[in-house]
């Protein structure tokens, strides 16, 4: 590097000398001395620069060496740290598994305690529910159906659908006739004889209701007519026959009235019934050909007291009735005979289908438009192909409650 600097100095001298004026005898020694001195200063500066550069290079080499040593140490430390972190991760994982196991044991104990508590609550609720049902159905009625003894055709009309009945509670001889499945006219006859003979006096009293009924599921209970309002899917009307006004109304909950109650009764969506325990509603559950739902209604306030999902299907059913708190469902094939009871439901569970004989109705050519039980005279009132029929029943005592 020094040789290069000196060569550069010589070239610089030659370059500057080329521009100097011609030598003069008196000035040449002084000028040469001046230039020489300046070049010496320049050489000294270049020498210092060279020394500084060498020192920098040496320091940089030492620094690089130190960095290499430190990087080697870092790699060693990194390996040690990786090993330590790996061991720590294994310990944390082991500790987490132990914590999860302890938590599982705690949750298992809590779950067992919760299940025991839930089971105890369910048993208590079931006991209270059973007590409530027994209290609700605690009437002086312990009969069960054993057979249909005979039938009596009381009257013949041209209308295929309709209903007829007496008051289920009041000791009144009056007979009520409701013609058709959608109407608002009630005919009131003084007694059964006046109903049977057209020309008998007094003549029937005609009453036009302010609302029309739907289906053939009407009942007379304590002087009130209960029926399904035609203008709605699930409204029950309580009509005061004496005052000729709507006394009260209610909506059955749960989507009631969207499907037919019975497959072979094409106009009845809610079938009302009366027995020794009071007022009931029979309707279909959700779905096509679903099971029947039994609902107990408090007739005074029109409040729902309880509902039961029964095992009885609406498919192939044509009618049903209640006797002493037990639901009896009448079935037929394609709407033709024989008409028989093949499904019953007892909310108290005292009787089942195995306890009953084969229950057949006397053969009729068509399905029943309605069959209603009257707890006062213990008979069935039915409508079949325009015939108003009374069925006499054979009963026996139920088994005692356990």
Swiss-Prot record:
Cellular component annotations (GO), alphabetically ordered: extracellular space
InterPro entries: Olfac-like_dom, Olfactomedin-like_domain
Keywords in alphabetical order: Coiled coil, Disulfide bond, Glycoprotein, Secreted, Signal
Localization (cell): Secreted
One GO BP annotation of this record: signal transduction
Stretches of the chain forming a coiled coil according to its record: 79-133
Carbohydrate attachment residues: 66, 138, 183
Disulfide bond annotation, renumbered to this chain: 141-324
Record-linked Pfam families: OLF
Mod. after translation: Highly N-glycosylated.
Main location: secreted
Tissues with expression: Mainly expressed in the small intestine, liver, lung and heart.
The protein's name: Olfactomedin-like protein 1
Gene from which the chain derives: OLFML1
């Amino acid at each position: 590097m020094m040789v290069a600097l000196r060569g550069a100095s010589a070239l610089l001298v030659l370059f500057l000398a080329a521009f100097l004026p011609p030598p003069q005898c008196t000035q040449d020694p002084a000028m040469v001395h001046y230039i020489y001195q300046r070049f010496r200063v320049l050489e000294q500066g270049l020498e210092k620069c060279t020394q500084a550069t060498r020192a920098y290079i040496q320091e940089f080499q030492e620094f690089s060496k130190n960095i290499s040593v430190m990087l080697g140490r870092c790699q060693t430390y990194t390996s040690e740290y990786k090993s330590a972190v790996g061991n720590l991760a294994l310990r944390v994982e082991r500790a987490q598994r132990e914590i999860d196991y302890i938590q599982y044991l705690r949750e298992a104990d809590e779950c067992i305690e919760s299940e025991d508590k839930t089971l105890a609550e369910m048993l208590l609720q079931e006991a209270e529910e059973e007590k409530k049902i027994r209290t609700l159905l605690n009437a002086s009625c312990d009969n069960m159906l054993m057979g249909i003894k005979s039938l009596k055709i009381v009257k013949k009309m041209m209308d295929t659908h309709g209903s007829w009945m007496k008051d289920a509670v009041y000791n009144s001889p009056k007979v009520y006739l409701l013609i058709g499945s959608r109407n608002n006219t009630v005919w009131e006859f003084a007694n059964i004889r006046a109903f049977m003979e057209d020309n008998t006096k007094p003549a029937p009293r005609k009453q036009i209701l302010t609302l029309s009924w739907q289906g053939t599921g009407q009942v007379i209970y304590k002087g009130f007519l209960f029926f399904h309002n035609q203008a709605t899917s699930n409204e029950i009307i309580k009509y005061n026959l004496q005052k000729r006004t709507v006394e009260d109304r209610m909506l059955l909950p749960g989507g009631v009235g969207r499907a037919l109650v019975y497959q072979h009764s094409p106009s009845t969506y809610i079938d009302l019934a009366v027995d020794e325990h009071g007022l009931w509603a029979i309707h279909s559950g959700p779905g096509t050909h679903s099971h029947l739902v039994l609902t107990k209604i408090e007739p005074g306030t029109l409040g729902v007291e309880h509902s039961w999902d029964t095992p009885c299907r609406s498919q192939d059913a044509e009618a049903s009735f209640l006797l002493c708190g037990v639901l009896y469902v009448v079935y037929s094939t394609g709407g033709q005979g024989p008409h028989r009871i093949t499904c019953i439901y007892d909310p108290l569970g005292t009787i089942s289908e195995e306890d009953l004989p084969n229950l057949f109705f006397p053969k009729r050519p068509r399905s029943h438009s309605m069959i209603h039980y009257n707890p006062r005279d213990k008979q069935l009132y039915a409508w079949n192909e325009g015939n108003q029929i009374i069925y006499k029943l054979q009963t026996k005592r139920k088994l005692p409650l356990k």
